[in-house]
């Protein structure tokens, strides 16, 4: 990830919305201006004010994180982003669909760093706790010219928050009636001189939830497995000298999923070191090393079965250089990744490794205040498949008051994974699945145009600010990696084999309207239309929906200009009937009522009624809403700091 104060994003925190209890002003025009000046890094890998970014970027800031009252990344994204949906895969691991792309085509980052491990082509989303997150940046569409493989359909970057107070301790706890779920966590920040420490711990536990009975032969899912999760992270920042900063991090993650007569256990060990050096005015250099090891195993009681052992280990070296030359900013970078995988899905629990090299350059040019253009070029090489990929991106923004116009083209690719190249797996006696060493990389071409208008209503009871955004996109997705029937031959059983298929065309429209009145009323409504042509991105786990929407109507009451006393919101999402060759749900909507009450010194109590109108699927498919009807939750957050 780029940055001077950059390291994934904290540079932007200075312009970010302040905590709810200390919001700087109730004046919506000032808040809107602050949001426009918020520094983002994901779209261009260099710090840039949101209003100046030529690529459409959705930012969920700290204030929105509190309003959404989401306990995990899945809830947050589905409540905020139409066209994005989480369901289950065959092993009841979480499966993503976003604008027609599956989880393998969307790159998730934490402070700009990749995550090791996958299950059914998706990362372990339970690793992405929100306890220490300051904001989330989402770029829809291909971004491989900056981020390489997997950024075919988009990038989601979780960026940690920073605090310079001498010390602070944030405690939180939450109970949900569905599955008797308990979540608890703490974030401890310490600062002394040139050194800052941030320690985060998150814990959750949930019982099994019965959705339907075992005699329901039509449903694919009958219950939601229970389990326990622990997530510990440490982040240490040292300002060594003026212009030189070191950031060290480490983390441990453990999850146990309790199945019917066994349990699956997941471990992750991660660490890294980053150096940020402002060489001189207008020049900076970033160097980093990261390590991530993700393991899976199966237990029957206390006995490890060793028939589901899995370990993915990634070592990544990264370098990034920025140079400002007047109105032109040049960026150059390179990465190396050592990717090692051993899994029960290889013959004889075998092991394979891959070396990946890349280099990229970018030019960011702003000749006049109302125009900005960015162009990027990148080449990647993958040793296992002996493939290389060249990708490019070009984007421009015009500010013609009161409109901002953004135009972009971006190329994307996804290299075959080690699993797709070398798999030799008997899927529970159902069929064999074979890898294909001759696979080619998936490629995509994304075109996007967006119009944005922001303004203010200056008189009357509706005085406040608003924004309107309309964007259209077209994706041509070529050489998509999927499976085909493979006839048996000799000692090789018949089964399914990974292959490349013909192109898929995905096009759509996103529309968003936001409004915030000085009196405290607010609205946020988003709609997505999606059309898929050519081939298909349809499966029993991920099915494109032509229509989807999210909304939130809220009211906040402040005491003076700096203390939020009460917050109430009615939010929801609508999912249209999927276009699919498989049996599916019909269209449905789920509504949520949220109440947040501040008590004393920032202590806040949250109460939520979810699925307000008691929706339940008649049949539970893999991508159905996994709900038993109306449920409720209650939580408390307690911030402590040196002002006590």
What are these regions (language model features)?
Residues 195, 286-298, 399-401, 405-406, ...:
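Membrane-embedded beta-barrel scaffold of Gram-negative outer-membrane proteins
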Residues 366-373, 467-469, 473-477, 497-578:
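Gram-negative outer-membrane beta-barrel transporters
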Residues 113-140:
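Short acidic/polar hinge/loop motifs at secondary-structure boundaries
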Residues 35-68, 95:
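N-terminal periplasmic "start-of-domain" segments of outer-membrane beta-barrel proteins
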Residues 42, 74-113:
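Extracytoplasmic beta-strand/coil segments of soluble accessory domains associated
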Residues 145, 157, 164-170, 174, ...:
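Periplasmic-side early beta-strands and strand-to-turn transitions of outer-membrane beta-barrels
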Residues 238-241, 280, 331, 348-475, ...:
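Structural signature of Gram-negative outer-membrane beta-barrels, strongest in the C-terminal barrel
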Residues 189-191, 226, 239, 363, ...:
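Conserved C-terminal beta-signal and adjacent last beta-strands/turns
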